[in-house]
Swiss-Prot record:
The lineage of its organism: Bacteria, Pseudomonadati, Pseudomonadota, Alphaproteobacteria, Rickettsiales. Its EC number is 1.3.1.98. Pathway: Cell wall biogenesis; peptidoglycan biosynthesis. Residues 27-207 form the FAD-binding PCMH-type domain. It comes from Orientia tsutsugamushi (strain Boryong). This is UDP-N-acetylenolpyruvoylglucosamine reductase.
Length: 303
């Protein structure tokens, strides 16, 4: 049974029993007990300071790399609004740096850099999602990861206090950053360099072409389902056990890239999670290797 929540007064927006499937790339998932979109960082800080401490908080980015279970999410689900989408130049004696709000789409950062002749962040065009989500999981593609370009990060803790971390403080590892306690990233400074518009454009086009040829980008999918292992790509192991194209309910392993799970139109979150767990079991039974989810799974499990 869900806990009754006493909500602080805020300047942002609350919605109760909000349908979360509309915000995820899989287009599945239940409702949020309370959905909150803060007006700005001050509003978010005030909310955190005044929300009873035992209430669960879940933060959403763009809804990629995410599976929300059918029974939904208790507590408060937070999605950063437009005030967290700003991109600005930062003065620095040693680097070219841009300040980016955590709610900004990775694609929009890549586009901004193209417009301003800034190189080094082209890989972001190949990573669906927001900057905040990318930092939280040290997202990467095409030979780069967030740890390679993050200079510093601003965040709020569970009590609404603001912290600034240098990249080294975030303990970046493969597909994760390790920090103590609950944090909501609000802004980051990213390192880039001067480059020609032609060079940047060519790199962006190459990445986008590769994505279109190798990933099911026009289907309902959340990106790579599993982390690669030390010795094998996840797709190689899935292919090895013969699960390319395999289905459970409306969920299917992509024929194009078998580390992508897709919703064929009528899948439930349970279909997708069960298909993923079947993959993990089969890979372990045949190879002794445990695949770890790269997709973040949140929400209440079915009884």
């Amino acid at each position: 049974m869900s806990t009754v929540i006493s909500l602080p007064k805020i300047n942002g927006e609350y919605r109760k029993n909000f349908k979360l499937s509309q915000l995820t790339w899989f287009k599945v998932g239940g409702i949020s007990q309370v959905f909150y979109k803060p007006k700005d960082e001050e509003d978010l800080s005030c909310f955190l300071k005044n929300l009873q401490f035992d209430i669960q908080i879940t933060v959403l980015g763009a809804g990629s790399n995410l599976l929300i279970r059918d029974n939904g999410i208790d507590g408060v689900t937070i999605k950063l609004g437009r005030s967290f989408n700003e991109i600005n130049f930062v003065k620095n004696n040693h680097y070219n740096i841009i300040s980016v709000g955590a709610g900004t789409l990775n694609y929009d950062v890549a586009k901004f850099c193209l417009q301003h002749n800034l190189g080094g962040l082209e890989f972001l065009v190949g990573i669906p999602g927001t900057i905040g989500g990318g930092i939280a999981m040290n997202a990467g593609a095409y030979g780069q990861e967030f740890k390679d370009v993050v200079y510093s990060v601003e965040a709020l803790d569970r009590l609404g206090n603001k912290h600034i971390f240098l990249s080294k403080d975030l303990n970046f590892e493969y597909r994760q950053c390790i920090v103590n306690g609950f944090l909501i990233f609000t802004k980051t400074n990213l390192i880039c360099y001067n480059d020609s518009k032609t060079s940047i454009s060519q790199k962006l086009q190459k990445i986008q072409t590769v994505r279109k040829l190798t990933q099911p980008i026009n289907q309902k999918t959340a990106g790579s389902a599993f982390r690669n292992t030390n010795n094998y790509k996840a797709w190689q192991l899935i292919d090895k056990v013969g699960l390319r194209g395999h289905s459970i309910g409306g969920a299917q392993v992509s024929n194009l890239h078998c580390n992508f799970l897709i919703n064929n139109g009528n899948a439930t979150a349970s279909d997708i999670e069960n298909l993923g767990e079947l993959i993990r079991k089969n890979v372990f039974d045949h190879t002794g290797i445990t695949l770890e989810w790269e997709i973040k799974i949140v929400g209440k499990k079915s009884l």
